[in-house]
Amino acid sequence: MKEVLSLLLVFIGILFLVGCGKTEKNVEGSLSDLMTKVYDGAGVSHEDMETVELNSENTPFYLGDVSFSFKEGLASEPIMSSVAHSVVLIRLNSASDAEKAKKEIKEKVDPNKWVCVSVDEENVYVESVGDLVILAMDNQNGEKLKDSFLNLSK
């Protein structure tokens, strides 16, 4: 009887732990709409920004020479400016790939990719919410953009 009761308590404990596990849900919406929300939430103007869809040819410029695949990506950078600024959103194939993707982006992205300007290493932010990853590089507004992105899940 004690064995049955012990097994039952263990089983209930496992169900409790699994049932209360944190599951991070994906952020819904088009990357274009989400990009606008990130800028607006950070209070950063995006009027003079150009958005570019990522493809196999331009991905190394925006993310570095990464090896992971993703469903879609969108980059936002100034059309013409002497300010180093880049925001990239990518939707991964699976949220389970987020940690690997963030690590690889952080290692391979070039914060000195512009001709006359650069972003300090401490102002390169790579975060994720579900299957969505942001790379924000900006010496003045990078942290605001990162925080705005993280608020998309709330």
PLM feature spans:
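Short, conserved charged micro-motifs
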Residues: 95-103, 142-145
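C-terminal motif of bacterial Sec signal peptides marking the signal peptidase cleavage site
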Residues: 15-19
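Surface-exposed, low-hydrophobicity interaction/linker segments
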Residues: 27, 31-78, 98-116
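Positively charged n-region of N-terminal signal peptides that target proteins for export
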Residues: 1-5
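A short, solvent-exposed beta-edge/loop patch
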Residues: 79, 117-154
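A short acidic-to-branched-hydrophobic micro-motif
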Residues: 84-94
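Sec-dependent N-terminal signal peptides
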Residues: 7-13
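Bacterial signal peptide processing site
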Residues: 21-23
